[in-house]
From Swiss-Prot:
Component of the cytochrome c oxidase (complex IV, CIV), a multisubunit enzyme composed of a catalytic core of 3 subunits and several supernumerary subunits. The complex exists as a monomer or a dimer and forms supercomplexes (SCs) in the inner mitochondrial membrane with ubiquinol-cytochrome c oxidoreductase (cytochrome b-c1 complex, complex III, CIII). It comes from the Eukaryota. Keywords: Membrane, Metal-binding, Mitochondrion, Mitochondrion inner membrane, Transit peptide, Zinc. This is Cytochrome c oxidase subunit 4, mitochondrial. Zn(2+) binds at residues 120, 128, 143, 146. GO terms for biological process: mitochondrial electron transport, cytochrome c to oxygen; proton transmembrane transport. It holds the Pfam family COX5B. It is found in: Mitochondrion inner membrane. It comes from Schizosaccharomyces pombe (strain 972 / ATCC 24843) (Fission yeast). The lineage of its organism: Eukaryota, Fungi, Dikarya, Ascomycota, Taphrinomycotina. One of its GO terms (cellular component) is respiratory chain complex IV.
Amino acid sequence: MFMNSMLRVSRQRAAVRSTVSLYRGFVSASIRRNEQNVVKAAAQELANAKEPSDLIGPGGRDGEVPTDLEQATGLERYELLSELSGRDAFDMKPLDASRKGTLTDPIMVTSLDPYRHIGCTGSPSGSHNLIWMTVYKDKLRRCPECGSVYKLKFMGDPNAEHSH
């Protein structure tokens, strides 16, 4: 009795698997036949990158290990191309810690988003432990330890949609 039910189940599974594998083989074969091989040259300088597909590297040549620039794609490639052209892609330099920001003369923080996370270590730099804060567009933010004031300078597109 048990053996008969096991044989019946195994026959059903075998039938389903063969149907699925035939279907998958047929679908992928038709896609491969209709696919056109369009090879586009990758941008080697930031000025030549006009659209997101330009930020896909060419990859390594056969038999060679690719360099970072050949292999990088997307934001990593954008950062590498920016460094080659002498620009700081993501504005990673530290904030001005030579002075304290005041309500009339705050320390300006640039951002492409309507907010940015910053860390304050006081003025002069290192005078207190690191305190993390979030600075929002159109609002001043004061460090609770040293009293330095920060303001966000929004440089992004105000009509941009969030993509997540």
